Design a protein with these regions (language model features):
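ER/Golgi luminal nucleotide-sugar-dependent glycosyltransferases, focusing on the catalytic module
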Residues: 1-160
Length: 160
């Protein structure tokens, strides 16, 4: 994906002045590209094997779940409560039905238009705006999780 970096930088560099926190637009677009590709691989597998998953989970490999979570199927997209920077919505983990997760995983396609339309950009505010535009309802279950790279055992509830 290193070959994509210069192209992506051309697409989004004019919006770098809008960045909040330590966000990086190239890293953000790369994250959503990888999310899209993972979902495409899942769909390819489903077609090849003749199966359809009822529930799709998107997470990161550096998340430590401190307690088991109950993945309940719903018409809403489940995004763990907390880790909401700048009044955005947590982008660490989400789960839901095929339709909601398909939409979630396709944020990449809207990335440039979203970054052009937003006054301030970080991953969480972009995700929140995208879900609002796509009319995706969310549930916010409490999930006790830690990021391994932070090397701490504290759960953050960055919500008011």
């Amino acid at each position: 994906e290193a070959g994509f970096e210069s192209k992506w930088k051309q697409l989004v560099s004019h919006n770098e002045y809008k960045l909040e926190t330590n966000a990086n637009l190239v890293s953000m677009i790369s994250m959503w590209y990888k999310t899209l590709r993972a979902n495409q691989l899942k769909k390819k597998y489903e077609n090849l094997m003749g199966v359809k998953y009822d529930l799709i989970l998107k997470t990161r490999p550096d998340i430590i779940l401190e307690e088991p979570i109950e993945l309940i199927q719903s018409d809403s997209l489940a995004i763990p409560f907390g880790w909401d920077w700048s009044e955005g919505i947590n982008d660490l983990m989400a789960w839901g039905n095929q339709s909601n997760m398909e939409t979630y995983c396709e944020l990449f396609y809207s990335f440039v238009s979203l970054s052009n339309s937003m006054d301030k950009i970080n991953p969480e505010t972009m995700l929140k705006e995208y879900l609002k535009i796509k009319n995706i309802k969310t549930e916010r279950p409490k999930v006790d999780l830690t990021l391994r790279d932070m090397n701490i055992k504290t759960t953050y509830w960055f919500c008011k």
